[in-house]
């Protein structure tokens, strides 16, 4: 690793992510925000590695992921299982072929890294870590590497050599890394990095007033993630409102204008349905929620843990999403529904069971770890700030 104490220039940290799914970029932004509060003598840059790959590769990589998650979940899950090996140190022949191919499309990215000359590289996605690790082995790069894993059950694709330290969202993840030959001294169970705003108290009365939410109803939040894989949202909305007359349903529609229009025409009584377009204040809404109906994305569920909000996880896609869901359900912070049609009835059951909601909320708070703060402290220590 470059020694920043031997130079008068600010220490340089490169946060490497990939714009496939929202969680990896959110994690990188959270760390960048935390580092921004740390020191003015620090140069931090975030790069989307996919933006520095050929257009055809970017289209296949992102498009394949989106298609699998939204249209072909079983095929996606099968591919996930077939590539999740070997569970031991070293590389299998198939892995070496895959990594060689990836190095070919990462040449522009590799040049960018060399030009930036970072003291430390922090990865929130697995694509580029092996390539940079090989550059370190060959003496072309002297920066250290940190890896921030964003799944509770990490896939073999996360494995890489020449990683100084690993940060995991949950203790359950550590067992898999040790099987890959990663020493326990290089593993920290930090929790998922989320924006520091999730750690700030939000007065309930102010949030209700600002968002014009009723104070006499439970708030249920429905979101389908960035690709809206949470089932037929409008149909779910209508059925939930039919079964649960004493709730206010907040639907996070993001930038989906078509969905916003359909929700606006849903004909719900005032105060019962609140469609929300894209906002960076979701933490306020979640803080007053009694239940979050969502997909089991790593960062999304970590935000719910920070807010202490029970989760109803809908039809987890086989793979990392299913792994996240199993972990949360096993620890009593979430309930899984494998069928969209069961979601409204499950919401009704939970709304009528205060004891179950309180227990889910308590378990969620107990699982939360302040990942951003832990990772930022480790970065500062590594750079001797």
Language-model features and meaning:
Residues 30-112:
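Conserved N-terminal ligand/cofactor-binding loop architecture of enzyme catalytic domains
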Residues 287-297:
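Acidic donor-binding loop of glycosyltransferase active sites
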Residues 27, 78-181, 186-189, 195:
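Active-site and donor-binding regions of nucleotide-sugar-utilizing enzymes
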Residues 204-206, 211-288:
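Donor-nucleotide binding loops and adjacent catalytic segments primarily
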Residues 164-226, 255-256:
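A nucleotide-sugar donor-handling region in carbohydrate enzymes
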Residues 356-369:
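A short, well-ordered alpha-helix in the C-terminal region of glycosyltransferases
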Residues 367-385:
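C-terminal alpha-helical cap of glycosyltransferases
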Residues 330-331, 339-355:
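C-terminal "capping" alpha-helix adjacent to the active site of nucleotide-linked donor transferases
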